[in-house]
Amino acid sequence: MTRYKAQISYDGSAFSGFQRQPNCRTVQEEIERTLKRLNSGNDVIIHGAGRTDAGVHAYGQVIHFDLPQARDVEKLRFGLDTQCPDDIDIVKVEQVSDDFHCRYDKHIKTYEFLVDIGRPKNPMMRNYATHYPYPVIIELMQEAIKDLVGTHDFTGFTASGTSVENKVRTIFDAKIQFEASKNLLIFTFTGNGFLYKQVRNMVGTLLKIGNGRMPISQIKTILQAKNRDLAGPTAAGNGLYLKEIIYEDKECFSNFRK
């Protein structure tokens, strides 16, 4: 068997998430269906680096899969790309070693979250940015977000009842930008891993800080108390994008860790 790694992007609006599930349209199901056609009707299982939720988008999701023979990677990419549905794009395919695993090999993820703060909201962005109708002071959020950088126990920012025992993660970079022409806030987080709904909970908390309903020090309070009840609401999934995944064998991986 020959193992392939692929970078894919998708519009998550019409998907119930990445991972295959009964009676739902998922990214995994659509790609596996296409691979089956390219593999003479034989099943192919794909593995994803991140399991995005319903409505969540991706520019840089990474998958891997095995095929019984070596193929020209550009022809394979082209075949997959043209036969997958229009809301999935196969950006790049490369052959990798048999022991490569897109989820378990050491990597760094970058997530982006878009918030439309326009009043009125932009209806064209309804599937691609979460609307926040309340006034915010961006400088308050830019100050508060600094407290997320570093190695912390993020229990207070994950979904209640998660089965993951070790909730310590490292965020290498966290920032907020504002595109005034589009009334868009762009939150960017880069780290060695993120807990279930962690990014959406961090954004929900930062928005409450920006609105003045939580103090700038609230991030520190949540990290110390490890209490989800102290954090803000979970921001909607339509504003979330899996932007990039960098593996340890890439030079830029070590640059992030410095």
UniProtKB/Swiss-Prot annotation:
Active site per UniProt: 53
CDD domains: PseudoU_synth_EcTruA
Highest taxon, organism lineage: Bacteria
One of the record's GO molecular function terms: RNA binding
Residues annotated for substrate binding in this entry: 111
Listed EC numbers: 5.4.99.12
Keywords of the record: Isomerase, tRNA processing
One Pfam family named in its UniProt record: PseudoU_synth_1
Keyword Isomerase: yes
GO biological process per UniProt: tRNA pseudouridine synthesis
Family the UniProt entry places it in: Belongs to the tRNA pseudouridine synthase TruA family.
Assembly and oligomerization: Homodimer.
Function: Formation of pseudouridine at positions 38, 39 and 40 in the anticodon stem and loop of transfer RNAs.
Protein name as it appears in the record: tRNA pseudouridine synthase A
Organism: Streptococcus agalactiae serotype III (strain NEM316)
Gene name for this UniProt entry: truA
